[in-house]
């Protein structure tokens, strides 16, 4: 899964961003569960999911701040 750049993330709608954030949070939970039960094969996936989640949450908070102003 290639990481999207900031321009690609900013082109998404608010609902798409929210859906992706929720999906990534679920995936991160599942990865933690798999790691705890020693079933996780791809440990690098943690980093990928966290980075993508941070990008989406940053864009979401930027939009909320600009809407509040």
Curated annotation (Swiss-Prot):
Keywords: Ribonucleoprotein, Ribosomal protein. The keyword Ribonucleoprotein applies. The keyword RNA-binding does not apply. GO terms for molecular function: structural constituent of ribosome. SUPFAM superfamilies: Ribosomal protein L29 (L29p). GO terms for biological process: translation. Belongs to the universal ribosomal protein uL29 family. This is Large ribosomal subunit protein uL29. It comes from Parasynechococcus marenigrum (strain WH8102).
